[in-house]
Regions:
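Detector for C-terminal structural segments
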Residues: 15, 26, 202, 268, ...
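N-terminal lobe/hinge region of extracytoplasmic solute-binding protein
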Residues: 38-91, 122, 189-193
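A structural "hinge/loop" feature
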Residues: 41-60, 83-84, 110, 161-170, ...
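Gly/Pro-rich hinge or "lid" segments in bacterial periplasmic/extracellular proteins
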Residues: 64, 74-78, 167-220, 224, ...
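Aromatic- and charge-enriched surface segment that lines or borders ligand/interaction sites
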Residues: 86-130, 151-153, 239, 285-286
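Surface-exposed binding/hinge segments that line
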Residues: 88, 99, 133-177
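Append "and occasionally in soluble cytosolic enzymes with long acidic Gly/Pro-rich linkers
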Residues: 208-213, 261, 287-378, 382, ...
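Ligand-site clamp/hinge motif
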Residues: 212-258, 386
Length: 511
């Protein structure tokens, strides 16, 4: 399936990338049923269930093209059948049941079975198996298979177990094939049950997919889909403007406004589940509550949205977007530079004697991410905070976050497309989560009981209370809910996906 090895691909990426970006070649390919996407991140791994890449929301567009989730999700975030045709709990929520489709085929032509479902869950549940949220999957065990129905005992109750089956690491892999080739063999030649099969891959350059002829969801609209890895936003703009790519995303908003009405192009820019935030890592100067709160009150979020993002975006003060189940509009952390100055003065800091620390950010991963951090650093400087900017790739962010080595402040885009507070505030702020930066016992005491709360109203209120406490303590700095800018050729029809995932098989088609 792969003409060259990944190592060879990395070595040769420069030359082949040049040929991939040639406009004439891709213009001709598009006419023949190929969709070319200038994508904003690279693909570090083909395993959608293990390692840091598995919890990167931006990669889900690719993973959901090659693999299938247990449970599907519509553009409005509601759930629908996928590999599971039905699912549920028993009355006292001590058992779960799942019915498996009988018309699903892997890319190698073999049939998907309930054993694949069980094996995938058990693999995810292994504490040393590399799944970043293994404890979620370890919540059910003692599986039994009767024809197409699977039953299991609930070992540790998790109210969002089935939501996770449509979320990060919730993918089913082929048991027989994976055990035959092993993890390295799977990386070299991955297969799934999704609408597209991997046809060719060149590290840091592109991924080419071809339609799965036996896909249970019907024939995909494009014979071939090419994800071109273009982390630089300026280059993505050039890709769509020159016609080298048919579609791109996460371009600067001024470029979106300029190009959306250009002949031959269209655009869509609507809110997604992506939240821009600054992680705050405990330790050093961040252990000072006055410093943390000053950081929060010194940032004029609305000004950033208006001036840098051309009005695209919504101010947030918690890690819950307006579409999330635990969103509470009464929790506010207002822009108040006078209060920020007063708080810093109480800890002995001023413009002449500023508190100093490093802030990390990506550059081009999200529209104006670096420029936004520059603006924030300027606002901080006005009240007595001197922050040094360090730029990194998003993959480095995951590496540092999972080892609790982020800088005192670090920009990130948090995606939570199931809208539950456990997958926003929970995983971002609970110290036992590998995705949290702030670790403290006082916050854990408020969050820990909520994981197993069976009363839904009490559970949601508990998360709202935790969000309020976090805001009062300044444990994280939420910035904004993003609107996702997508530009595409006018002969395409693109359906906005609130999750932010671009899905060539279902939400992109020929007009």
């Amino acid at each position: 399936m792969f003409p060259i090895t990944r190592r060879q691909a990395l070595a040769a990426s420069g030359g082949l990338l040049t040929s991939l970006l040639a406009p004439r070649r891709f213009a001709a390919a598009a006419a023949g049923g190929t969709l070319n996407i200038a994508y904003n991140v690279n693909l570090p791994s083909f395993d959608p269930n293990t390692g840091p890449s598995s919890v990167n929301p931006t990669l889900q567009s690719i993973y959901r093209s090659v693999f299938n989730n247990y449970i599907g999700q519509r553009p409005d975030l509601s759930f629908e059948p996928a590999l599971l045709s039905a699912w549920g709990w028993n009355e006292d929520k001590t058992k779960v049941w799942m019915d498996v489709r009988n018309d699903v085929f892997w890319h190698d032509g073999s049939r998907l079975t309930p054993e694949d479902i069980v094996w995938s869950i058990q693999r995810n549940a292994k504490p040393d198996g590399g799944n970043p949220v293994s404890f979620i999957w370890a919540g059910i065990d003692n599986f039994k298979i009767d024809d197409k129905r699977i039953t299991a005992d609930v070992v540790n109750y998790d109210p969002v177990l089935f939501k996770w089956m449509a979320f990060l690491t919730g993918y089913v892999l082929p048991k027989t094939y994976f055990e035959k080739v092993g993890p390295q063999g799977f990386e070299a030649k991955p297969i799934g049950s999704g609408p597209y099969m991997v046809d060719a891959y060149e590290g840091n350059a592109y991924l080419r997919l071809k339609a799965h002829p036996k896909y249970w969801g019907g024939k995909p609209p494009f014979d071939t889909v090419v994800f071109k890895f273009v982390p630089d936003a300026t280059t993505r703009v050039a890709e769509i403007e020159s016609g080298a790519s048919d579609l791109t995303l996460e371009v600067p908003y001024e470029e979106y406004d300029r190009l959306k009405g250009k002949a031959g192009l269209k655009g869509v820019c609507k809110p997604t589940c992506d939240l821009g935030l600054l992680f705050i890592t405990n330790g050093g100067v961040m252990d000072d509550k006055n410093v943390r709160l000053a950081m929060c009150h010194a940032v004029d979020k609305q000004s950033i949205i208006k001036r840098l993002l051309r009005g695209y975006g919504t101010v947030i003060d918690t890690l819950e977007g307006p579409e999330y189940a635990a969103f509470d509009p009464t929790i506010k952390v207002p822009f108040d530079p006078a209060l920020a100055t007063k708080l810093l003065a109480a800890s002995g800091y001023s413009k002449d004697k500023p508190v100093k620390f490093t802030i990390q950010t990506t550059r081009g991963f999200k529209p104006k991410d670096y420029e936004m951090i520059q603006a924030i650093v300027g606002m901080w400087r006005n009240v007595g905070i001197d922050a040094n900017i360090e730029v990194y790739e998003v993959a480095k962010h995951f590496e540092l976050r999972m080892t609790h080595k982020l800088a005192p402040a670090a920009f990130y885009n948090w995606g939570n497309y199931i809208g539950d507070p456990t997958t926003s505030t929970g995983f971002a702020m609970w110290s036992k989560s590998p995705h949290s930066a702030w670790h403290s016992d006082d916050l854990d005491a408020k969050i820990t009981p909520l994981w197993a709360e069976k009363d839904e109203a009490r559970r949601i209120q508990g998360w709202k209370d935790a969000d309020r406490y976090i805001a009062e303590q300044g444990y994280v700095l939420p910035l904004l809910q993003y609107a996702q800018p997508i530009l595409y050729k006018s002969d395409l029809k693109v359906t906005h996906n609130t999750s932010g995932a671009l899905l060539p098989a279902s939400l992109i088609e020929k007009a």
